[in-house]
């Protein structure tokens, strides 16, 4: 839950950035010196907390490489920070949040967000699984897309049309289930959902006996040659787990963004979570809460329309 306390932020936009859309997050303006010669041109945006020093504004205004915007936003809300950067500079797309490896800032909004060390920006590849700048939609599986029955069924046949339309719109579709790899694989096969998702994430599970059809690689992925699927095991360390009073770990955008980056999706417009559990939502741009479905129910068109409307409203906002 975001704090109601507002902090002032200075966001700078570099006029002649070599690499566009990435955001460098600093503890203070003076930290720019740690980038070294000409490295500042790799970051179009720079953001840091405003310390109410009027002299600082004058110094920045005299640096003609940058234009400056000041805005207020909660210090623990990445969603608000991203929105304000986009709003201030009228850009619908951002790249990675980057930090100095030798002097990382300690802002709360950086929790549960994938942070790219500043020196890795130049090594990012341009080839991607998608053209243009996509919206990312993350779906839960159990009681969201499928039922809770022992023999699972699709929640609503309209789910297929919904996923197909989102795919045709250029969205990157991610499935993230806290179920075991076997459960996810077999459930998707049983309801014919295998071909719709660009990334499939499941909670890590221990294989009880050695199986010749499973091969695990160095990227925490298991390739199941019987099912012809590649599953990513969630082995990330969560930043906020120790700060929560319950045992529900949210579906951190950190993990999604990391695997998007692995597929060279380094820029996106918005990220949406579609899930029946509100506790899974943390720092997503949009959250679509669905009702549980122990058995099939024909209600998916309502949720589909909400997803689409959010995307359309987002696009319209930046056309104004």
Swiss-Prot record:
**Which UniProt keyword terms apply here?**
Host cytoplasm, Host nucleus, Virion
- InterPro entries for the chain: DUF705 (IPR007827), HAD-like_sf (IPR036412), HAD_sf (IPR023214), HAD_SF_ppase_IIIC (IPR010033)
- Tell me, in one coarse class, where this protein mainly resides: virion
Instruction: State the GO CC annotations.
Output: host cell cytoplasm; host cell nucleus; virion component
- Localization annotation: Virion; Host nucleus; Host cytoplasm
Which SUPFAM superfamilies does the UniProt entry name for this protein? HAD-like
Superkingdom in the source lineage: Viruses
Pfam families per the record?
DUF705
Function noted in UniProt: Plays a role in nucleocapsid assembly and is essential for viral replication. Distributed over the cylindrical capsid sheath of nucleocapsid.
* Complex formation: Interacts with VP1054, VP39 and VP80.
Q: What is this protein called?
A: Uncharacterized 38.0 kDa protein in P143-LEF5 intergenic region
Taxonomic lineage: Viruses, Viruses incertae sedis, Naldaviricetes, Lefavirales, Baculoviridae
């Amino acid at each position: 839950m975001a704090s109601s306390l507002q902090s002032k932020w200075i966001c700078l936009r570099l006029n002649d950035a070599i690499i566009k859309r990435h955001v460098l997050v600093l503890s203070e303006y003076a930290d720019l010196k740690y980038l070294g010669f000409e490295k500042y041109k790799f970051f179009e945006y720079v953001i840091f907390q405003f310390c109410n020093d009027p002299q600082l504004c004058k110094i920045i205004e005299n640096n003609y490489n940058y234009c400056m915007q000041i805005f207020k936003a909660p210090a623990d809300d990445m969603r608000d920070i991203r929105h304000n950067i986009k709003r201030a500079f009228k850009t619908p797309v951002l790249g990675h949040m980057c930090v100095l490896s030798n002097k990382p800032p300690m802002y709360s909004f950086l929790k549960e967000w994938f942070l790219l060390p500043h020196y890795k920006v130049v090594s990012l590849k341009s080839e991607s699984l998608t053209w243009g700048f996509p919206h990312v939609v993350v779906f839960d599986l159990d009681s969201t897309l499928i039922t809770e029955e022992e023999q699972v069924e699709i929640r609503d046949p309209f789910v297929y049309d919904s996923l197909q339309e989102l795919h045709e719109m250029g969205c990157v579709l991610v499935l993230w289930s806290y179920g075991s790899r076997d459960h996810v694989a077999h459930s998707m096969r049983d309801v014919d959902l295998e071909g719709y998702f660009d990334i499939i994430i499941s909670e890590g599970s221990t294989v009880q006996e050695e199986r010749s059809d499973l091969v695990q690689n160095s990227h925490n992925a298991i390739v199941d040659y019987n099912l012809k699927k590649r599953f990513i095991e969630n082995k990330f360390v969560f930043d906020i787990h120790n700060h929560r009073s319950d045992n529900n770990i949210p579906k951190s955008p950190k993990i999604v963004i990391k695997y998007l980056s692995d597929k060279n999706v380094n820029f996106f417009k918005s990220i949406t979570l579609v899930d029946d559990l509100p506790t899974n939502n943390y720092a997503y741009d949009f959250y679509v809460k669905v009702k549980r479905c122990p058995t099939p129910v024909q209600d998916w068109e309502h949720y589909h329309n909400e997803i689409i409307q959010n995307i359309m409203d987002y696009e319209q906002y930046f056309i104004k």
